[in-house]
Design a protein with these regions (language model features):
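Conserved short acidic donor-positioning loop in nucleotide-sugar-dependent glycosyltransferases
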Residues: 5, 17, 32-35, 61, ...
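Acidic donor-binding segment of Leloir-type glycosyltransferases
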Residues: 14-56
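C-terminal subregions of glycosyltransferases and related glycan-biosynthesis enzymes
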Residues: 15, 19, 180, 189-274
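Glycine-rich, basic loop-to-helix element that forms the pyrophosphate-binding segment
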Residues: 57-74
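Short aromatic/hydrophobic "clamp" motif used to bind/position activated sugar donors
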Residues: 79
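The conserved acidic donor/metal-binding loop of glycosyltransferases
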Residues: 83-87, 112
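Conserved donor NDP-sugar-binding/catalytic core segment of glycosyltransferases
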Residues: 91-124
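Conserved nucleotide-sugar donor-binding catalytic segment
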Residues: 130-211
Length: 274
């Protein structure tokens, strides 16, 4: 679990791991040189739980480098991650472990998420589910359909690691390379994580570098994309950059999916789902 300057949220994430039905886990927390860290450090020390390892770096190295640092230290057979502003349901590890045999044929496992757009919730029933499609290579060529976390063999992720040269789309890139090397992933049929999307604190992934990161991802992998996927990716880049699209460019990127996306963004159909 990478963390930076979000003590209260990180505590909630840790508490959700402590509530796991499956108890034979290790948690590696890497603090990327947070200026405010004493409360979190004291909280971890107070738990006196040998399964939890807390490391605070002496300098800020970035989210990808911190993730790689934790991945390299992992000792278990399987590995997954958690962002410091998210929360696991008690059955998350158990659910993945029930399907661990799928990793003989699939690169990794992934699941649906619950979405919370406030600081808290009363019950799971009050949250909406963010549904993810079953794996499809063509769809994965167009966008990240698996989300921000996966469950896989530790040895695989230690081989792949996150690309520290990417300013954004690091998850997409790492999971894409995992699928390339070890086979398409498998989706389990339940939601096991809560993503908090409006907690009001600094968001690590929000920066002006988003366009640069996605453009670098496109250049890195575009030779593997068919024409339709390239059009979809390029439309996404225009959207991220918030650059007006000329009619000439729109014609060049014309495909059914992009027409639907354009309608969602610019017309009375913007509230529709496609």
């Amino acid at each position: 679990m990478p963390t930076w300057n979000r003590e209260a949220l990180a505590k909630r994430a840790v508490e959700s791991i402590l509530k796991q039905e499956y108890t034979n886990w290790e948690l590696i927390i890497v603090d990327d040189c947070s200026p405010n860290y004493l409360n979190l450090q004291g909280f971890i020390e107070g738990l006196a739980d040998s399964r939890i390892k807390y490391i605070r770096n002496d300098y800020n190295s970035g989210a990808c480098a911190v993730r790689n640092q934790a991945i390299k230290l992992a000792k278990g057979e399987f590995i997954t991650g958690i962002d410091d502003d998210d929360e696991w349901l008690p059955n998350r590890l158990t659910s993945f472990l029930k399907d661990q045999h799928k990793l003989h044929q699939h690169a990794f496992l992934y699941a649906d998420d619950y979405i919370c757009d406030t600081s808290g919730y009363l019950s799971l029933e009050s949250l909406r589910i963010y549904p993810k499609p079953d794996y499809n290579q063509q769809l994965f060529n167009k966008k990240n359909i698996v989300g921000n976390q996966v469950f896989t063999l530790t040895s695989r992720l230690q081989t792949i690691l996150f690309d520290t040269q990417l300013a954004a789309a690091q998850d997409y890139d790492a999971f894409y390379r995992l699928a390339e090397q070890y086979g398409g992933p498998f989706k389990i049929k339940m939601a096991t994580q809560i993503l908090y999307v409006n907690h009001g604190e600094v968001r690590i992934t929000a920066s002006r570098k988003k366009f640069s990161g996605y453009f670098s991802f496109y250049k890195k992998h575009s030779s593997k994309f068919d024409k339709s996927s390239k059009k979809y990716q390029l439309f996404t880049l225009y959207y991220i950059r918030k650059k007006p699209m000329s009619f000439r460019v729109f014609r060049r990127l014309l495909c059914l999916r992009n027409v639907k996306r354009y309608m969602m963004l610019h017309t009375v159909f913007k509230d529709k789902k496609f």
